[in-house]
Amino acid sequence: MFKVKFYIRHAVLLLCGSLIVGCSAIPSSGPSAKKIVSLGQQSEVQIPEVELIDVNHTVAQLLYKAQINQSFTQFGDGYASAGTLNIGDVLDIMIWEAPPAVLFGGGLSSMGSGSAHQTKLPEQLVTARGTVSVPFVGDISVVGKTPGQVQEIIKGRLKKMANQPQVMVRLVQNNAANVSVIRAGNSVRMPLTAAGERVLDAVAAVGGSTANVQDTNVQLTRGNVVRTVALEDLVANPRQNILLRRGDVVTMITNPYTFTSMGAVGRTQEIGFSARGLSLSEAIGRMGGLQDRRSDARGVFVFRYTPLVELPAERQDKWIAQGYGSEAEIPTVYRVNMADAHSLFSMQRFPVKNKDVLYVSNAPLAEVQKFLSFVFSPVTSGANSINNLTN
C-alpha cells in the first residue's frame, strides 16, 4: 500500500512539472486581457496593427454624438416645392378665343366649347434654354415661373392679336422637381408638388418596407451629405420626417443588425438587434451578463473596424503618418473596465454597431482553476482506479 501511494505522489509531481512547462496549451475560449492589450503596444517603427482605446466618459460621448448626428433634422425642415418650372418639364397649353375667332379658328386641335373656340396645343417640352414655343407668340422663358405666371404671359401677348383670349397652362410631367426613391424590387421617381412631400411620402411611394420595420433603415442623400435613420425612429419622431427637396435620393436599406458575443460568456452566439441601435450595457444584458466564476470584469472588449475620421484627432495623426488615407478603416479595440463603477455610465452611451465582436476575457483565477482541474483530474482518476484494484 505504501508503494502505491509513493508511485501516485511521484506521478503527480511528474505530471505537474510537464504541464507547468506547457500550461499555455490549456484550452481557452480566447486570448487573455493581457494579450489583447499588447496588440496596441507595437513598436513605433512598425505600422501599428490595432488601435486600442480605453472607454471612458469622453470616448463614449464622442461615439454617442456621432450616432446622434445621423439625423435628418441636420438638414433642416426645408420648404415645400414652389411649383416652379424647370428644364425638361412638359406643359399642356389650352387657349380659348371668343367668337369670331381671329387666330385660332382652325388648324390645330380645336373645337367649339359653348360660345368660345378652344385650341389645344401639342405638349410643350421646356428646352435646354428654358423656353417653350407658342404660335403667334414665339418663345417664352418659363424657367423659375409657375404655370399660372406663364399663362398670364401668354394671355398678355395674345390680347393684341386674338379676340378676348383665355389661357390655361398645366404641368403634365414633372421631370425636374423630383426625388429618386430606391428600394429592392421597386424604385420610382416621385415628383414634388406644392403640397410638400416628406420622407415618409417617399417610403409610401414604393410600398413601404419589404422586411420588418425594426430591420429597415432609411438613407437620405442631399448633395454630398448622407444621413441614415432607422425607419422606427422616422415613424416615431415627426421631426425626422422632413420636407424633401429637388434632387434628393431616398434609399431604403434592409439589413438586420447583429453583433457576436465571444469569450467567457457561456457560449459564442450572434445576437440580432434593431436598426435603432443598442448600447453596450444593453448588449451585455442580451448576452446574459458576465459569468462570475470565469470572466474578467476588467477585460471586456469591443472589436470593430472604425473609419479613420471617427478616431480622436490625436490618434488619426498616427495612422495618417503611416500612410493611411482618410477613407481607411482602422481595426480598433475598445476596452471597458467593468470593475470601475464609472464604466456603467459610459456603457449606457457607448453604441454597439453592426458586426461588432464583444469579447469577455477569462479571469486569471479561472485560468488557475482550469489548470488545476486539468492536472489533477487524470491523477485522481488514476488513483481511484489503483485503490479499487488494491482493495
Curated annotation (Swiss-Prot):
InterPro entries: Poly_export, Poly_export_N, SLBB_dom. The chain crosses the membrane at residues 34-43, 58-67, 84-93, 118-127, 136-145, 149-158, 162-171, 179-188. One of its GO terms (cellular component) is pore complex. Belongs to the BexD/CtrA/VexA family. The keyword Membrane applies. Involved in transport of capsular polysaccharides to the cell surface. May function as a membrane anchor for capsular polysaccharides. Possible porin properties. Residues 23-33, 68-83, 128-135, 159-161, 189-391 are periplasmic. Residues 1-22 form the signal peptide. Keywords: Capsule biogenesis/degradation, Cell outer membrane, Ion transport, Lipoprotein, Membrane, Palmitate, Polysaccharide transport, Porin, Signal, Sugar transport, Transmembrane, Transmembrane beta strand, Transport. A lipid is attached at C23 (S-diacylglycerol cysteine). It is found in: Cell outer membrane. The gene is ctrA. This is Capsule polysaccharide export outer membrane protein CtrA. One of its GO terms (molecular function) is polysaccharide transmembrane transporter activity.
